[in-house]
């Protein structure tokens, strides 16, 4: 896909500032992933600086991984400001379906904010969509490609957004068309925060292209970087460091050689 390679170059030329309201577990790895890729991360959630920070950011990433009574209002306020300013907003509903608080928080943000991309695994996306009566329930352990395609399409339509259902194959849809991305490696599941990092990388690409292509670009680049990392470091600790290295090293030529992306009309 030509646009993935071009977006990578454009991202590095523009060095977008990506504001993350994310969880404690992944702040460091997310920031390092963005820096390695060529974006600028900022982790800012204080209520008193949100207006200033959102106004200068190129995109906002909201990740609900470690919710509490202080962070939720900050997430909601930031999403409202970003919507008013028409900034790209990427929502990662970490653990939606596991508790009522997580599901309710994700749904509230989806209901009032103009979310550009909703990125989660099958169970998380099914959970928020299930609350709207569109799915049979949450089952992230066992699903087939047709179910993932339908889920991505239905979530995009229901929430008027781009839905990225990530797994062994990533499915990204705007409700009208869908991309299947087969890049990545199972070792990603052995390192905490890799899904969260991919969400923030989508945020960086959202600063240089429309949501559908931004999501495809981010997931493709991250997936290729993971494949290359595993070829050099097949164990979790060194693999994580090598992912940073390949986010830094990946270029247009490697994207053209390694991208496994297919587009389907719905």
UniProtKB/Swiss-Prot annotation:
**MF terms (GO), sorted A to Z:** ATP binding; hydroxyethylthiazole kinase activity; magnesium ion binding
Query: Any idea which positions bind ATP?
Result: 119, 166
- Known EC number: 2.7.1.50
Pfam families linked to this entry: HK
Q: Which Gene3D superfamilies match?
A: 3.40.1190.20
Q: Which UniProt keywords apply?
A: ATP-binding, Kinase, Magnesium, Metal-binding, Nucleotide-binding, Thiamine biosynthesis, Transferase
The entry marks the following residues as binding substrate, namely 43, 193
Q: Which cofactor does it need?
A: Mg(2+)
- TM annotation in the entry: none
Q: Which reaction does it catalyse?
A: 5-(2-hydroxyethyl)-4-methylthiazole + ATP = 4-methyl-5-(2-phosphooxyethyl)-thiazole + ADP + H(+)
* Gene Ontology terms: biological process: thiamine biosynthetic process; thiamine diphosphate biosynthetic process
Repeat among keywords: no
What's the stated role of this polypeptide? Catalyzes the phosphorylation of the hydroxyl group of 4-methyl-5-beta-hydroxyethylthiazole (THZ).
Return the similarity comment: Belongs to the Thz kinase family.
Q: List the HAMAP family hit by this protein, alphabetically.
A: Thz_kinase
- Recorded protein name is Hydroxyethylthiazole kinase
> Which organism is the protein's source?
Methanococcus maripaludis (strain C5 / ATCC BAA-1333)
Gene that this sequence comes from: thiM
């Amino acid at each position: 896909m030509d646009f993935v390679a071009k977006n990578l170059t454009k991202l590095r030329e523009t060095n977008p500032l990506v504001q993350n309201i994310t969880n404690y577990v992944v702040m460091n790895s997310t920031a390092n992933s963005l820096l390695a890729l060529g974006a600028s991360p900022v982790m800012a959630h204080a209520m008193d600086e949100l207006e200033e920070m959102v106004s200068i950011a190129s995109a906002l990433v909201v990740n609900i991984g470690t919710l509490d009574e202080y962070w939720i209002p900050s997430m909601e306020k930031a999403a409202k400001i970003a919507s008013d300013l028409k900034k790209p907003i990427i929502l990662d509903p970490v653990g939606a379906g596991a508790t009522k608080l997580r599901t309710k928080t994700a749904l509230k943000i989806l209901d009032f904010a103009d979310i550009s991309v909703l990125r989660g695994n099958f169970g998380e996306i099914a959970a928020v969509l299930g609350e709207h009566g569109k799915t049979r329930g949450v089952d992230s352990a066992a699903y087939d490609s047709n179910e993932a395609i339908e889920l991505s399409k239905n979530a995009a339509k229901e929430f008027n957004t781009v839905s990225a259902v990530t797994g062994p194959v990533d499915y990204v849809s705007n409700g009208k068309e869908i991309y299947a991305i087969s890049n990545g490696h199972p070792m990603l599941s052995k390192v905490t925060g890799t899904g969260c990092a991919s969400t923030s990388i989508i945020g960086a690409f959202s600063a240089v292209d429309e949501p559908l292509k931004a999501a495809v670009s981010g997931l493709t680049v991250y997936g290729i970087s993971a494949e290359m990392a595993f070829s050099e470091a097949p164990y979790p600790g060194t693999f994580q460091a090598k992912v940073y290295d390949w986010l830094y090293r990946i270029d247009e030529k490697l994207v053209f050689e390694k991208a496994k992306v297919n587009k389907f009309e719905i």
